[in-house]
Amino acid sequence: VGLGVAKQLGWRATIGLVSAIGIVALAGLALRKASVVPAVPSSSLGQRLRVIGRVDNFLTILVTFFVGVGSLGLYTYIPVVLDRVQVDTIAGMWVWGIGGAVGAFGIGRVLDKVNSSRKLTVTIIALLVTDFALLLLFPSSHVVAVVCLFAWGLLGWSSMAPQQHSMLSANPDEGATAVAVNASANYLGSAVGSAVGGLLLPSSTGILLGALGAVLVGIVCSIGASASSRSHTGDNVN
């Protein structure tokens, strides 16, 4: 919908539409606050630092950060990537978005069936590494480009759920604080990735290499988080 509005009325109209939807949602929450929004006490700075201070938590947060740098940060410059592989910008964003929707709605079912959310995270990031590598290696293949765009959206949008599951499993008494910190790392990674990508413009190769490097660091951190979690608990905690 946003793409259609932007094409007909300009990008400012899309931003206005998003803002209008946000205002309606905020008004709805305000009117039904008592019955819809649970009362969750805010966490103190000490609680947040305690969560971050555990090695397995810190490594998990780093995973989220670096995947955010690579996946969401790269998405900021998707027109540059699409120009490299000679795919129409609107069509490419549709493919990416459909992949993202499939990933966001489908990852819960996958997570319910696997034994370890940490192993699932490693698998997702490994596939994301492969995806970015293929975009670099086959810049003139439309088939590779379309498949990789779909997979990029799917993998990027599905990466958060197993991460949040890992944080909840590792922090049963401070779950709300843990997932909030992890979510913040995702958006911080996106912002940092966007800033770094701007420095690499107009080189699409440089942007893709930067994204690839970020997710490679992410997979190393993910393996470290899994090992640290087992060491911390003495067993295979998800």
PLM features: what roles do these ranges have?
Residues 14, 19-39, 220-226:
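C-terminal membrane-cytosol helix-exit motif in multi-pass small-molecule transporters
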Residues 55-104:
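Extracytoplasmic gate region of multi-pass secondary transporters
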Residues 1, 25, 67, 96, ...:
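Structural signature of transmembrane alpha-helices in multi-pass secondary transporters
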Residues 32-63, 238:
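Juxtamembrane intracellular "pre-TM" segments in multi-pass secondary transporters
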Residues 117-163:
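C-terminal transmembrane helical hairpin of 12-TM major facilitator-type secondary transporters
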Residues 7-20, 198-216:
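A membrane-interface helix-boundary motif in multi-pass transporters
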Residues 6, 103-116, 201:
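Helix-to-loop junctions at the C-terminal end of transmembrane segments
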Residues 169-204, 210-213:
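A late C-terminal transmembrane helix in Major Facilitator Superfamily
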